[in-house]
């Protein structure tokens, strides 16, 4: 899908809770071999939301940063879409909370999206379509989650909290969208039924037929459509469920480590689900120079991938410092014990 009109990112923002738990702390409780865990998942620690944080508060913080960089009146935002698989309410949209918090209400459309870890990129596609068609001036797309892993499950080492937001428009772009491509199938690799507190894994479906197949098909489809190859990109961002998968899929597609390593943050923050690939994207934008081309490929269980190509403009240097960089959130951390973590994540039921 190639936009018929110029469209792209006007402002972007990230947010990561300051609390962290080290892999060693989790391993000590469950008697796991921490060296095997860290080498297998390529992760050191993960973010933990405080008792007063949820995907809505994370979305609000990221949105405020995006609007600050966009330098727009929030009233000009015509659509807000929040992608998450951990909304604080079963029946009440997160998008309206964000709209009110940033002063965008009441003349706009808003909705919540759910497609596992790629709901945020689906929101970007929708906003881009509305903006390019002329139906709205600006759209705000957000991916935010407070992921859960069952006590003792390997997922507990990676399921984390964080999010990113993007103001989509046609003028004053910091990154122009060249195109987007999606690949979608019905693959039962990961799910959580209504009423279940924690998700379940699909075993043999979780690797090659899910993550790798979808990301590779989406990335190749986009590059073929745009007549681009891996060497045409300065940065490549892939969904980061752990540190091993994005590096492996990058090699499979022909990307070099220097294109990928600057965008990998999972080792320091964990898998933020809907925020995962988008946080990697903000890491690239935080250091990109005008003219740089960035590939972003999300993945959501169930299953699907959205791929994008963006070209950074000169305006990035004007607005980058108008909101906190992702690195500032990664450095601002307070470590907690497993007991504190269990309390914050409400794993203890009374």
Curated annotation (Swiss-Prot):
Name the catalysed reactions.
acetoacetyl-CoA + acetyl-CoA + H2O = (3S)-3-hydroxy-3-methylglutaryl-CoA + CoA + H(+)
The reply on keyword Flavoprotein is no
Q: What is its EC number?
A: 2.3.3.10
Asked if Iron-sulfur is a keyword of the record, the answer is: no
According to its UniProt record, which residues of this chain constitute the active site?
A: 85, 117, 239
Query: Which Gene Ontology MF annotations are present?
Result: acetyl-CoA C-acetyltransferase activity; hydroxymethylglutaryl-CoA synthase activity
Q: Which InterPro entries match?
A: ACP_syn_III_C, HMG_CoA_Synthase, Thiolase-like
Give the residues the record marks as binding (3S)-3-hydroxy-3-methylglutaryl-CoA.
Answer: 33-34, 117, 158, 206, 239, 248, 271, 301
Which residues participate in CoA binding?
A: 204, 244
Q: In which pathway does it act?
A: Metabolic intermediate biosynthesis; (R)-mevalonate biosynthesis; (R)-mevalonate from acetyl-CoA: step 2/3
Per UniProt, which keywords does this protein have? Acyltransferase, Isoprene biosynthesis, Transferase
Its GO biological process annotations read: farnesyl diphosphate biosynthetic process, mevalonate pathway; isopentenyl diphosphate biosynthetic process, mevalonate pathway
Protein role? Catalyzes the condensation of acetyl-CoA with acetoacetyl-CoA to form 3-hydroxy-3-methylglutaryl-CoA (HMG-CoA). Functions in the mevalonate (MVA) pathway leading to isopentenyl diphosphate (IPP), a key precursor for the biosynthesis of isoprenoid compounds that are building blocks of archaeal membrane lipids.
SUBUNIT field: Interacts with acetoacetyl-CoA thiolase that catalyzes the precedent step in the pathway and with a DUF35 protein. The acetoacetyl-CoA thiolase/HMG-CoA synthase complex channels the intermediate via a fused CoA-binding site, which allows for efficient coupling of the endergonic thiolase reaction with the exergonic HMGCS reaction.
- Family listed: Belongs to the thiolase-like superfamily. Archaeal HMG-CoA synthase family.
- Its name, as the record gives it, is Hydroxymethylglutaryl-CoA synthase
Q: Which organism is it from?
A: Methanopyrus kandleri (strain AV19 / DSM 6324 / JCM 9639 / NBRC 100938)
């Amino acid at each position: 899908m190639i936009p018929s009109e110029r469209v792209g990112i006007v402002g972007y923002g990230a947010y990561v809770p300051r609390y962290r738990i080290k892999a060693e702390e989790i391993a000590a409780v469950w008697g796991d071999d921490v060296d095997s865990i860290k080498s297998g998942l390529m992760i050191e620690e993960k973010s933990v939301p405080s008792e007063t944080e949820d995907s809505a508060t994370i979305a609000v913080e990221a949105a405020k940063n995006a609007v600050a960089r966009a330098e727009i009146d929030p009233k000009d935002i015509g659509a807000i879409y929040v992608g998450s698989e951990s909304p604080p309410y079963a029946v009440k949209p997160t998008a309206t909370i964000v709209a009110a918090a940033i002063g965008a209400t009441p003349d706009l459309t808003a909705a919540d999206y759910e497609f596992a870890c790629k709901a945020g990129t689906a929101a970007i596609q929708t906003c881009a379509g509305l903006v390019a068609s002329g139906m709205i001036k600006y759209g705000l797309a957000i991916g935010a989650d407070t992921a859960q892993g069952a006590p003792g499950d390997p997922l507990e080492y990676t399921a984390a909290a964080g999010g990113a937001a993007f103001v989509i428009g046609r003028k004053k772009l910091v990154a122009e969208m060249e195109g987007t491509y999606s690949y979608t199938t019905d693959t039962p690799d990961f799910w959580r039924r209504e009423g279940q507190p924690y998700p379940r894994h699909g075993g043999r479906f979780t690797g090659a037929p899910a993550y790798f197949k979808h990301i590779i098909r989406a990335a190749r489809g986009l590059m073929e459509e745009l007549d681009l190859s891996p060497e045409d990109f300065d940065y490549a961002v892939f969904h980061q469920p752990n540190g091993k998968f994005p590096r492996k899929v990058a090699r499979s597609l022909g990307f070099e480590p220097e294109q990928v390593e600057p965008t990998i943050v999972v080792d320091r923050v964990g898998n933020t689900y809907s925020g995962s690939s988008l946080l990697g994207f903000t890491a690239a934008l935080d250091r990109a120079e005008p003219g740089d081309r960035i590939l972003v490929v999300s993945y959501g269980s169930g299953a699907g991938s959205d791929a994008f190509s963006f070209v950074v403009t000169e305006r990035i240097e004007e607005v980058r410092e108008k909101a906190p960089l992702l690195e500032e959130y990664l450095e601002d951390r307070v470590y907690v014990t497993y007991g504190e973590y269990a309390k914050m994540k409400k794993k203890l039921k009374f």
